[in-house]
UniProtKB/Swiss-Prot annotation:
Residue ranges crossing the lipid bilayer per the database entry: 3-23, 30-50, 66-86
Catalytic activity: a quinone + NADH + 5 H(+)(in) = a quinol + NAD(+) + 4 H(+)(out)
Function of the molecule: NDH-1 shuttles electrons from NADH, via FMN and iron-sulfur (Fe-S) centers, to quinones in the respiratory chain. The immediate electron acceptor for the enzyme in this species is believed to be a menaquinone. Couples the redox reaction to proton translocation (for every two electrons transferred, four hydrogen ions are translocated across the cytoplasmic membrane), and thus conserves the redox energy in a proton gradient.
EC numbers on record: 7.1.1.-
Family label: Belongs to the complex I subunit 4L family.
The species this protein was found in: Anoxybacillus flavithermus (strain DSM 21510 / WK1)
Subcellular location(s) per record: Cell membrane
The protein, known as: NADH-quinone oxidoreductase subunit K
Single GO MF annotation: NADH:ubiquinone reductase (non-electrogenic) activity
Pfam families the UniProt entry points to: Oxidored_q2 (PF00420)
Length: 103
């Protein structure tokens, strides 16, 4: 028994909405970074689902998904490095307190 495409799309929509809500409402930059990663994972679910159920099924969606995972890992590494440097300089990682470039 196969899972229909609509189930994958609803799941990806829920993941994306949860990530978007967290990215827009939370004030902790680590949580915002995690929510952005959640949104990227929703995109990966869509890529794989459309690859499986598309007009010409193949591995294109999986390849794009692996590329997206690689980019997300690099983004997370750079984001965490920036957060560590920010914490060393400002002693905080809350968005409200680090919104300016001034020391």
């Amino acid at each position: 028994m196969s899972v229909p495409l609509s189930a994958y799309l609803v799941f990806a929509l829920m993941l994306f909405c949860i990530g978007l809500y967290g990215a827009l409402t939370k004030r902790n930059t680590v949580i915002v970074l995690i929510c952005i990663e959640l949104m990227l994972n929703a995109v990966n679910v869509n890529l794989v689902a459309f690859s499986k159920y598309g007009m010409n099924p193949g591995i294109t969606g999986q390849v794009f998904s692996l590329f997206t995972i690689t980019v997300a890992a690099a983004e997370a590494a750079v984001g965490l490095a920036i957060l560590i440097a920010l914490y060393r300089n400002r002693k905080t990682i809350h968005i409200d307190e680090v919104d300016s470039m001034k020391r």
